[in-house]
Amino acid sequence: MSAALLLATLLMTGLGQVAQKLTVEHWRLVAADGWTARLRSPWPWLALLALGLGLLCWLLLLQRVEVGSAYPMLALNFVLVTLAARFVFDEPVDRRHLAGLLLIVAGVALLGRSA
């Protein structure tokens, strides 16, 4: 159950970050149309929903796992969001980014073994 809650937290908060980026991309396109057009976009609402669900999953997870064990696992969001940046937004990911992501995964694996 804890692993499922952690995964749900990661996916919801990662989705929320992607939806925030989609929000600002859309807002650039409709900037001249004012706030009404901005608020009609589905992206800010998806961001709020995903981040809200992520918070709920996180709170449920904290009922089962110590925060010192659970919180470092959220670093995996750096990996998820970087992958989304590359494949959804076609942003460049260089070797330095990849090395950093590998270090994050190694750190999470190391901390996960001790938890």
UniProtKB/Swiss-Prot annotation:
Pathway where it operates: Bacterial outer membrane biogenesis; lipopolysaccharide biosynthesis
Pfam families from the UniProt entry: EamA
Alphabetized UniProt keyword annotations: Cell inner membrane, Cell membrane, Lipid A biosynthesis, Lipid biosynthesis, Lipid metabolism, Lipopolysaccharide biosynthesis, Membrane, Transmembrane, Transmembrane helix, Transport
One annotated GO molecular function: carbohydrate derivative transmembrane transporter activity
Tagged with keyword Cell inner membrane: yes
InterPro entries: EamA_dom (IPR000620), Flippase_ArnE (IPR022883), Small_drug/metabolite_transptr (IPR000390)
UniProt record, GO biological process: lipid A biosynthetic process; lipopolysaccharide biosynthetic process; transmembrane transport
Disulfide bonds: none
Subcellular location: Cell inner membrane
GO cellular component: plasma membrane
Gene3D superfamilies with a match to the protein in the record: 1.10.3730.20
Transmembrane segments: 42-62, 65-85, 93-112
UniProt membrane topology term: Multi-pass membrane protein
EamA domain boundaries: 46-113
Family: Belongs to the ArnE family.
Functional summary from the UniProt entry: Translocates 4-amino-4-deoxy-L-arabinose-phosphoundecaprenol (alpha-L-Ara4N-phosphoundecaprenol) from the cytoplasmic to the periplasmic side of the inner membrane.
Subunit structure: Heterodimer of ArnE and ArnF.
Protein name: Probable 4-amino-4-deoxy-L-arabinose-phosphoundecaprenol flippase subunit ArnE
Organism: Pseudomonas aeruginosa (strain ATCC 15692 / DSM 22644 / CIP 104116 / JCM 14847 / LMG 12228 / 1C / PRS 101 / PAO1)
Lineage: Bacteria, Pseudomonadati, Pseudomonadota, Gammaproteobacteria, Pseudomonadales
